[in-house]
Swiss-Prot record:
Residues 1-4 are cytoplasmic. It is an enzyme of class 2 (transferase). Its EC number is 2.7.8.-. The chain crosses the membrane at residues 5-25. NCBIfam families: lytR_cpsA_psr (TIGR00350), PRK09379.1 (NF006897). Keywords: Cell membrane, Cell wall biogenesis/degradation, Membrane, Signal-anchor, Transferase, Transmembrane, Transmembrane helix. Its main location: membrane. This is Polyisoprenyl-teichoic acid--peptidoglycan teichoic acid transferase TagU. Pathway: Cell wall biogenesis. It is a single-pass type II membrane protein. It is found in: Cell membrane.
């Protein structure tokens, strides 16, 4: 769902500042404040003195964990969705891997195995990053976290979105007919969370998440939504976190955006069933996981 959110944010920035004059200055000032607010470094990003350590060089391949946090009220919740993307600006290509939330794996820092989405509940984004790195055997350079409960604010801020729905269903009091439908923030949240009535299960849910995000990107980057740019920035500020700095965001917008033109989506094969404890898990064969690891490491140009 979220693989383009960074480029969407920066695309809006680029459109809004071309007006020039005082308006452009005010917009840039608001954007700068928003990017400062969403910047949340990982614990490992700081040295013993609390100073952020250097990141990778410009124009080198990078990996990003896109994490949808299922936070409701005071409940920290679990990661509602996990997606890893790798970007290689040398050949302008991108690979994306959506990790099923029920995937059974070692939870780094807990000394046990569990569903991969439980890592967020146990140790927040730091433990999620470490667990995904262990699971895929690839380094994660950056993360972008979106509060899924507050994602509806972003949808409403751009005036709702239009998507093409391929499965008629009802969820959380909202009915979704087949065909083109317009979604408010609340409807978009229900639309992207449903999976039990979908024969494709979590994979169908992931597809709807991508649909909504792509619609948000298209709507948010259009001139018709500029009048509400303040609402958009407020929604981002409240619901997005990342360890990317402002400079890194602008560098990424400049050097990595063309990677979107050549995208490959990699699915994780496996088998879902109940374990002896009666809990449903998604099991990924070692050979299948190694194949994905090899693809990602090659794309990141990692030789060791």
């Amino acid at each position: 769902m979220k693989k383009k959110i960074l480029f969407w944010i920066l695309g809006i920035i680029g459109i809004m500042i071309i007006g020039g004059g005082v308006y452009a200055y005010n917009v840039y000032s608001s954007v700068s404040k928003t990017l400062d607010e969403v910047h949340k470094p990982l614990k490992r990003d700081k040295d013993s003195n609390g100073v952020e350590t250097a990141k990778i060089s410009k124009s080198e391949p990078v990996s990003i964990l896109l994490l949808g946090a299922d936070e409701r009220g005071e409940d920290k919740g679990r990661s509602d969705s996990l997606m890893v993307i790798t970007l290689n600006p040398k050949n302008n290509s991108m690979k994306t891997v959506s990790i099923p939330r029920d995937t059974y794996t070692e939870i780094v820092g807990k000394g046990k195995s569990d569903k991969i989405n439980h890592a967020y509940a146990f140790g927040g984004v730091d433990m999620s990053v470490a667990t995904v790195e262990k699971f895929l055997s690839v380094p994660i350079n950056y993360y972008i976290e979106v509060n899924m409960e507050g994602f509806k604010d972003i949808v409403d801020a751009v005036g709702g979105v239009d998507v093409n729905n391929d499965l008629e269903f009802t969820a959380n009091g909202h009915h979704f007919a087949k065909g083109n439908v317009h979604l408010t923030g609340d409807q978009a949240l229900a639309f992207t969370r449903m999976r039990k009535e979908d024969p494709r299960g979590d994979f169908g849910r992931q597809m709807r998440q991508r649909q909504v995000m792509q619609a948000v990107i298209k709507k948010g980057a259009s001139f018709s939504s500029l009048s509400s740019y303040g609402d958009v920035l407020t929604a981002i500020q409240k619901n997005v976190k990342t360890n990317l700095t402002q400079d890194q965001m602008f560098d990424m917008q400049k050097n990595y955006k063309n990677c979107l033109q050549n995208s490959e989506e990699i699915q994780i094969p496996g088998d879902g069933h109940k374990a002896a404890d009666g809990i449903w898990y998604y099991y990924v064969p070692d050979a299948a996981k190694q194949d994905i690891t090899n693809k990602l490491r090659a794309h990141l140009e990692l030789t060791k």
